A protein has these predicted regions:
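N-terminal intrinsically disordered/low-complexity leader segments
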Residues: 1-8
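Helix-turn-helix
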Residues: 9-12, 16-54, 58
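Hydrophobic alpha-helical connector segments
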Residues: 58, 69-98, 137
Length: 177
């Protein structure tokens, strides 16, 4: 009988893999390559995550969790919160995670497993984390931020995308939301 994964060890491995992906990206790297980079074996990654695709989803989930953890620290005024969140999300060191997120998302909307399992949590977890804020406004903000990130990842036009993010914050400010 196979041993159940040790959750503390899984957490350590996930943290190490997230750090590795931040430094060198994931692309089409093999499990063996990623495992060697974090000082373990591909068998241990398989034991704790099941497959390369499940590892990719675990990375996306962890990065999303870390980003949701920022919500309580954001300013209370919506326009200021948008600007602060964008300032965080636009950091170049997050780009490998953003590329991975969109890759997994695209594969999921095509129905490919295990990526389709990231829905509907990819939205609902943000709605829950926002608490009492109007869910339609949270969903709108999430959609705009993801659209801006997709534009940034695809074009690398930081100035143009930053201007669009500022325009969105200005719209929210003028609307009095």
């Amino acid at each position: 009988m196979a041993r159940a994964p040790d959750l503390a060890r899984r957490r350590e491995l996930l943290d190490a893999v997230v750090k590795e992906v931040a430094a060198r990206g994931i692309g089409d790297r093999s499990l063996r390559d990623v495992a060697a980079a974090v000082g373990t074996s591909h068998r241990m990654l398989l034991h704790h995550f099941g497959s390369r695709n499940e590892l990719l989803l675990a990375i996306v989930d962890e990065v999303e969790r870390r980003q949701r953890a920022l919500l309580p620290e954001l300013p209370t005024k919506p326009a200021a919160a948008i600007a602060a969140m964008w300032a965080h999300l636009r950091q170049p060191e997050l780009r490998p995670f953003e590329r991975l997120f969109f890759e997994c998302y695209a594969r999921g909307v095509q129905g490919e497993q295990p990526f389709a399992s990231m829905f509907p949590g990819a939205v609902e977890e943000w709605l829950a984390a926002a608490g009492t804020t109007d869910p339609s406004l949270v969903r709108l903000g999430l959609a705009v931020m993801r659209g801006l990130l997709l534009d940034l990842v695809a074009t690398e036009d930081s100035a143009g995308v930053d201007a669009a993010a500022q325009s969105f914050a200005d719209l929210v400010r003028r609307a009095g939301a």
